[in-house]
């Protein structure tokens, strides 16, 4: 037996009720039966013409890094951005976000901490004035659709096979690090490329 959501194959996590076998390893995300795929949303993919405005210009090194990120993503490669805290990693990915949206791709930005989700949402909304940027985290789950989705790692379970580009920040931090369930949910949320941001790889 294998859970198609979290990848679990350990027998001790499978239980049987009147509806059949189901996985309890990822039960916090809702009941899913053995052999059952997570619900897939009908996703509208339409080009969104947008531009972003920064509060300060990027340095030549930052511009070069932003261009290289776009280049690798255009070649369908996953990217790791390793830079110190405060180095402007969020600003470095804005060009990639813009170009993805213009092509009609769905973009998600996942991070471990709720407070940072709210902070990133505000920064992205300030930069991309014409986008509907939404935060999906504890206390903010009524609206789950927008032009750009910023969410905690846990909330990725809502987005099975949705994102063409998934930006993942703080992948080295709790609770994502070492959590096999969250890793599988993140894998299933993205049908394209992943862009990892970290200060401590």
Task: Please name every model-derived segment.
Residues 153-197:
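SF2 helicase catalytic motif II
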Residues 74-96:
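Walker A/P-loop
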Residues 1-45:
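Interdomain "pre-motor" coupling segment immediately N-terminal to P-loop NTPase/helicase cores
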Residues 123-160:
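Inter-Walker segment of RecA-like/P-loop motor cores
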Residues 54-77:
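N-terminal pre-P-loop "Q-motif" helix
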Residues 105-113:
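Conserved RecA-like ASCE P-loop NTPase motor core of nucleic-acid helicases/translocases
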Residues 104, 131, 190-193:
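Short glycine-/polar-rich loops that comprise or flank the Walker A/P-loop
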């Amino acid at each position: 037996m294998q859970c198609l959501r979290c990848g679990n194959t350990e027998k001790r996590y499978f239980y049987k009720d009147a509806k059949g076998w189901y996985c309890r390893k990822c039960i916090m995300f809702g009941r899913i039966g053995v052999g059952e795929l997570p619900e897939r949303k009908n996703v509208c993919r339409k080009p969104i013409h947008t531009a972003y405005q920064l509060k300060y210009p990027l340095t030549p090194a930052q511009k070069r890094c932003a261009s290289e990120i776009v280049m690798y993503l255009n070649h369908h490669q996953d990217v790791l951005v390793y830079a110190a805290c405060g180095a402007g990693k969020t600003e470095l990915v804005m060009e990639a976000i813009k170009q993805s949206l213009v092509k009609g791709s769905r973009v998600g930005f996942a991070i471990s901490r709720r407070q940072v989700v709210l902070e990133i949402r505000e920064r992205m909304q300030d930069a991309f004035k014409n986008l509907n940027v939404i935060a999906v985290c504890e206390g903010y789950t009524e609206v789950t659709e927008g032009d750009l989705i910023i969410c905690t790692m846990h909330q990725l379970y809502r987005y099975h096979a949705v994102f063409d580009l998934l930006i993942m920040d703080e992948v080295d931090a709790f609770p994502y690090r070492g959590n096999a369930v969250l890793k599988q949910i993140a894998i299933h949320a993205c049908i394209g490329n992943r862009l990892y941001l970290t200060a401590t790889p």
